[in-house]
């Protein structure tokens, strides 16, 4: 269950990049007391960390998203524990009567820990479904090529806007929310934000901002965390 959840939580953030093939898969980063699954397409980065895995030591590998998707679909129907063994080129997943052998992506995965914001002091707590529904509604009026939306955050409220000047379209919604920090205006590609919010199962999300030019950190609220801890990093875009 944990492995399937980890794949499901990260696979949508993998890239289709012929130049950087290591980003076309999920990075399995094992430590002595935890396992972290990471995926990124350079616009968004998703980490899923669990302490339920029994790990023999520090190690890592990159599994291409295609076998990862197959593995997840099989694990969704099988609730047994999974044994993972690998070398420099191959990984073997064994569970129940099944053995799945996959070729690994060879190369160095980006240093993902360096891009995770540590001191974003402006914090928004908001109902995930409410934010998701609002972004979907507003994004209908966004430019179809860019999908840009803008969040204007002030104490106790969030304003979400989108516009398509070519078709004279605009949308605007104001939400009451729990926001503490300096006023922040930040732009995102709406489809990326929708993906992240859709793939979190929590009731409340926490978004942490430094300013409008640096990446936002998106995590479930602490009371919603269960077996795995998820964090998402979303790069901003310039908006007027």
Segments (PLM) and residue ranges:
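DNA polymerase processivity clamps
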Residues: 1-49, 53-105, 120-240
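Bateman (tandem CBS) regulatory domains
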Residues: 115-119
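Glycine-rich, pocket-lining loop/helix-strand segments that form or immediately flank
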Residues: 108
